[in-house]
Amino acid sequence: MKTHVKALVVGGGAVGTSIAYHLAKAGWQDVMLLERDELTSGSTWHAAGLLPYFNMSFATTHIHDYSIKYYKTLEAETGLNAGFSVVGNLRMAQTDARMDEYMVYATTAETCGVPYEWLSPAQIKERYPLVNCTDLKGAIFHPTDGYINPADVTMAMAKGARQHGVVIERKWQVDGYHWTGSDWQVTCTKMTEKGGNLLPSEEQIIITAEHVVTATGNHAQRTAKLLGLKIPAIPVEHQFIVTEPDPDLVAWRAEGNPEHPVLRDADAKWYVREERGGWILGPYERNAPARFEFGVPDSFRADLFPLDLERIE
């Protein structure tokens, strides 16, 4: 294993693999990525994968624009499908105030060059008969939005990074960062599996790196403690429900109809999208509990929290 690198990326989720890929694509030689478990095993693998083109921030919208165009090139470059579905995004409104809010969205979208379309309840019902429009005032539709499979896009970026010379090492945990004044001395411990838990072994190495980038997700507070910093990044519990196949939806798609857009109802506080003949329903929760303020337990790996439906009733 290499012990001297130009850039060391810590964390093998969607963010870490993207950083490693882009450094190598920009011409950086000698880049290494470390992941303490398996790629995507942290906060990446179970994300809903919503990928909006439009955002109320001008700068963020341009980042989204780059990302969407980039994801479309990954399969041609790596041979791996990133699971990107451009189905559109329908933001529905139950009140006049919400429609006024969407007018602001529209002006921002025009500034950023993002296409949009206004739809009345009747037009929504004509296009998507399964959508209940009885309480709607209208909607703004963004045809270039969609969703992506987080695990698939991470694996595609990891392969692309390797193709550009990045070395990816799994089962290595960073346990210390020391800045010498000219480079970083990064203490790494080999992780082993015992009884379903991921535990540190006695094998350690020190990697010398000119640059270190941390993308540790759920482990951000541990990273901050190792660096002597305070990072305002705390994982917050989010839940979504994946339904069984919906007979009405299955019949709709069997007739050759297109996939529904991502449906967002800010007044009802839900987003919905299709998933394998059924639906993913995600609530916009208030006061969702924070997690891992003091570190991630050894027993928590690619796991889910217990469902708490009472919190979203």
What feature does the model see in each segment?
Residues 141-211, 219:
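Helical element adjacent to the flavin cofactor pocket in flavoenzyme catalytic cores
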Residues 197-259:
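Central helical "cap/lid" subdomain
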Residues 230, 246-313:
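Active-site lid/adjacent beta-loop-alpha segment flanking the redox-cofactor pocket in flavoenzymes
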Residues 2-15, 32:
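Beta1/beta-strand and adjacent pyrophosphate-binding region of the FAD-binding site
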Residues 49-127, 267-272, 276-278:
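Dinucleotide-binding Rossmann-like beta1-alpha1 core, especially the glycine-rich loop
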Residues 12-13, 17, 36, 216:
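Glycine-rich Rossmann-fold phosphate-binding loop(s) that bind the pyrophosphate
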Residues 24-45:
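Glycine-rich FAD pyrophosphate-binding loop
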Residues 58, 62-65, 92-101, 141-163, ...:
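Short beta-strand to alpha-helix junction loop
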